[in-house]
Amino acid sequence: MKGRIHSIETFGTVDGPGIRFVLFMQGCALQCAYCHNPDTWDTTIGTQVTVEEVLAKIEPYLEYYRRSGGGITVTGGEPTLQAPFVAELFRECKKRWNLHTALDSSGFCDPQHAKELLEVTDLVLLDLKMMDREGHIKLTSQPNDRILRFTAYLAERQNQIWVRHVLIPGITDSPTDLYEMGRLIGTMPNVQKVELLPYHRMGVYKWQQLGKEYPLEGVREPEKQEVDRANAMVQAGIKAGKEEKKNKVGKPAS
């Protein structure tokens, strides 16, 4: 089986616990305005590799991954577009080395398409963009209906989840939207961590190299106090979501 990849990183430290082998898959159905890897969107380019070829690149660094409590993270692009390939890769990583596996996904995927992949995934890094449907379309080119269905499916499973959200001033920092995102997270018992990632402009040069106009030109990076306020709003939503779930579970059937 072959997959189409963009690149690899052998010493990743921000995409899951420990030191990790990070595999960037090629292809994405979203076109996020702040994307720092727009060169991963096109599904027709990249490098075709077999599972065995990827395993051979992991093996020399196994000791680092094991000692640090790390493993392998597959990101993109959107890795669920190549779910069968990633599932086979994770399956072999577990069979050969019992390696921790993490999937970094936007959730833009039909649940049944990712079922086999999730069965061999220890951790899902779920990148939630926005709760508001129209705002989501403007930001990513796609509605969030499919993402919300996938998120609900994840909540029913045993996979550990880290939720990540990119905070963009004036775009993804609406108090109402952050609160509603928190409410959703609060209903998900398997969410272990929530990270608000401050928007940055480090990928702008890639848009320029591709001859694309950067959609967020002029948008500034958030201040620390703005990130703190956003975190507080999300946490308030999480508290409300947990309380609502608790009351719903404890309510007698009519």
Task: Label each region the model flagged.
Residues 59-63, 68-71, 76-202:
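Conserved AdoMet/S-adenosylmethionine-binding subsite of the radical SAM
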Residues 41-44, 132-138, 206, 217:
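A short acidic, helix-capping loop that chelates divalent metal ions and anchors anionic groups
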Residues 7-9, 13-49:
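Canonical Radical SAM [4Fe-4S] cluster-binding loop centered on the CxxxCxxC motif
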Residues 48, 141-144, 221-224:
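Short, conserved loop/turn and helix-capping segments at secondary-structure boundaries
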Residues 2-12, 169-254:
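Auxiliary Fe-S-binding modules of radical SAM enzymes
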Residues 38-68, 72:
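Conserved alpha-helical substructure of the radical SAM core
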